[in-house]
């Protein structure tokens, strides 16, 4: 198969194995705060709340969100200043056994519900993206093979199946073995159906060509007969 004619979408499935992370806007929604407030707290309490970055963007874990929720309790419920809240954090970090971070049960439950909803949405997005990518790869492969000659069709499709199987196996390994089997069965069924359609089209084309040849022969014979008649009458009137 021509390497340039077959391209696959690069799918990143790292989220299947890694802990879910959240953006600043998502954290702001979970904690019911403005994004600017979340960024301000992150800067003020960076010595106590360690948040990873991806480029210039922060990636919040569940633990980070819990720490920010505790910080919100200190500032909004206990009415502490930034410096007082920093001292509370310092005390917690230096003597963790004597201090615990307490957040109201109602707010914790609400945050847990939002977090669970966000996690389900992310998993659903991953699932949809995976299915869309696989569907796109199959449709592109079939469309490409339909435009090739009959002799190259089977060879090209077999190569495509091998590459698809290797690609999917290398990307998602054991987690999608069942999907690979279903995909192979789908491609086999599609191949059989495609071959039938191509043969049907080919047979119709042959029949059409034969009919056209027959029609041309009949027209040729009619023209010859008319020419013969014209020649006969021409000779008759010249006498």
Swiss-Prot record:
Residues 217-228 have a biased composition (Basic and acidic residues). Pfam families: MerR_1. Forms homooctamers in the absence of the last 13 residues; the coiled coil domain is required for oligomerization. In the presence of GTP and Mg(2+) binds to TubZ and also to TubZ-TubR-tubC DNA; the latter is reshaped from large filament bundles to rings of 30-40 nm diameter. Its main location: host cell. It comes from Clostridium botulinum C phage (Clostridium botulinum C bacteriophage). The gene is tubY. GO terms for biological process: plasmid partitioning; regulation of DNA-templated transcription. GO terms for molecular function: DNA binding. Residues 150-229 form a coiled coil. Residues 138-239 are annotated as: Required to bind TubZ. This is Regulator protein TubY. The keyword Coiled coil applies.
